[in-house]
Structure formats: structure tokens, C-alpha cells
């Protein structure tokens, strides 16, 4: 692959632009439901979350092969860690910490106009393997750079992004399982009634559908794609 970036794009307001994160799109059009669901998930993650983290200067992950880095800064910071599982997140955390601790103004960008096509896991076994790797890598990296957590010196990355990752990524499976167990236990002993549970579950489901539709619509508009009825049904489902 050949990627051409204008030299002037690496400097803006005297800040070193360390890296670019490209938007990636699943290709070809997935036939399995497992892969189709990831199309929506990727749109929600990259069209929404990365835009938001861009605004607050808190991007913590440049997705693997879909990023470009300033070579000299990467070398000065120590390069890739050979023992890192989530090497993409580890490098971004390392670069951010290095620049902040050495007083180097920097910027990490997500650029949606740069597009890279990729393939998603087509079955649950491959998806489980991928997500296990992501989860272990995130836990390893957050532990390695725990000095940044809630530390105002590291800006929004330490004060906001990392706490969000801990609450909604690392601890989310445990919280959800404990929540389900608590609801079942509460229903079984009569401590809670079924109606509030159904209302909250329905509200959560509707919010998820709405978020998916918004993300999907944004992706469709940006690519000027033609939609089929079954595509919209997959998104809602």
C-alpha cells in the first residue's frame, strides 16, 4: 500500500502531529449476522467515539494497521513494546506520556476522510478470540500506564478517557453479570417488581436501536450508498 501525506499536515500551530487514525470499513458486504452486527458497531465506535475523543484531545487508540506515526518521535519514545498484546494502544499511550512528560506539544488525529477496507470476524469463535485479545491488551496497557489515571497532568486522556475505558470497557462485563444476577435474585425474593425491570430493559433496547440507526445513517450518508430493505432490518435487529 502507498500512503501519501503532505508534509505540512504534520505541523499545526507549532504542535507535532504524532499520528493519524484512518476510518476503516468492513469489506466485502458481510453475509453472516456476526459480521453484519460489527458494521454497525464499527460505525458507532469510529463515527461517534473517536470524533468525540478528538474534540477533547483524548484519543488513546490508533487502530493497528490503520494508523500513521511520526517515526522520529516513536524512536525517541522507545518504539513498540515487544511484550505488548494491544500494541496499538500501548504505542499511543507511550507517545502521549512521552510528549507530556518532556513538554512536547503534540496532537493525535482521527481522520474520517481517509478510508481503509477491512474484514471482520465471520463467526463467534473468531469474534471471541478477537475481543479477548482486545480486552487483555487494554487491561495490560491501563495497568502499565496507571500513573496517568485521574492525573490532570495528562489532560483529558488521563482525567476522562482512561476512567471511561475502565468503567465501560474493562469492568462492563463484570458489572453486567452482577446486574443480571441482582435482578434475578431481587425478582425471586420479591424485592423488586417485574414492571420496572421491563420498562428499563425496553428503554435500554430502544436507546441501542436509536444509536445504531444514527451511526448507520451517518455511514450511509458519507458513502452515498444505496440501501436495501433487509439492510435496514439488520441494523434494527
What is each residue range found by the language model?
Residues 153-168:
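Membrane-water interface at loop-to-transmembrane-helix junctions
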Amino acid at each position: 500500500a502507498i500512503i501519501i501525506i503532505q508534509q505540512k499536515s504534520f505541523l499545526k500551530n507549532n504542535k507535532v502531529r504524532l499520528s493519524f487514525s484512518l476510518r476503516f470499513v468492513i469489506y466485502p458486504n458481510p453475509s453472516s449476522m456476526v459480521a453484519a452486527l460489527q458494521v454497525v458497531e464499527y460505525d458507532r465506535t469510529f463515527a461517534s467515539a473517536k470524533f468525540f475523543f478528538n474534540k477533547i484531545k483524548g484519543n488513546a487508540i490508533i487502530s493497528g494497521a490503520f494508523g500513521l506515526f511520526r517515526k522520529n518521535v516513536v524512536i525517541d519514545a522507545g518504539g513498540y513494546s515487544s511484550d505488548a498484546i494491544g500494541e496499538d494502544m500501548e504505542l499511543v499511550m507511550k507517545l502521549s506520556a512521552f510528549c507530556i512528560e518532556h513538554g512536547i506539544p503534540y496532537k493525535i488525529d482521527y481522520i474520517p476522510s481517509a478510508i481503509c477496507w477491512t474484514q471482520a470476524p465471520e463467526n463467534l469463535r473468531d469474534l471471541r478470540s478477537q475481543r479477548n485479545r482486545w480486552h487483555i491488551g487494554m487491561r495490560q496497557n491501563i495497568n502499565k500506564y496507571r500513573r496517568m489515571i485521574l492525573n490532570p497532568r495528562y489532560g483529558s486522556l488521563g482525567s476522562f478517557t482512561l476512567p471511561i475505558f475502565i468503567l465501560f470497557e474493562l469492568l462492563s462485563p463484570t458489572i453486567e453479570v452482577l446486574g443480571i444476577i441482582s435482578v434475578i435474585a431481587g425478582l425471586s425474593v420479591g424485592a423488586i417488581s417485574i414492571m420496572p425491570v421491563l420498562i428499563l430493559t425496553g428503554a435500554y433496547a430502544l436507546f441501542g436501536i436509536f444509536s445504531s440507526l444514527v451511526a448507520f445513517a451517518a455511514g450511509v450518508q458519507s458513502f452515498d450508498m444505496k440501501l436495501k430493505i433487509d439492510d435496514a432490518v439488520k441494523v434494527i435487529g
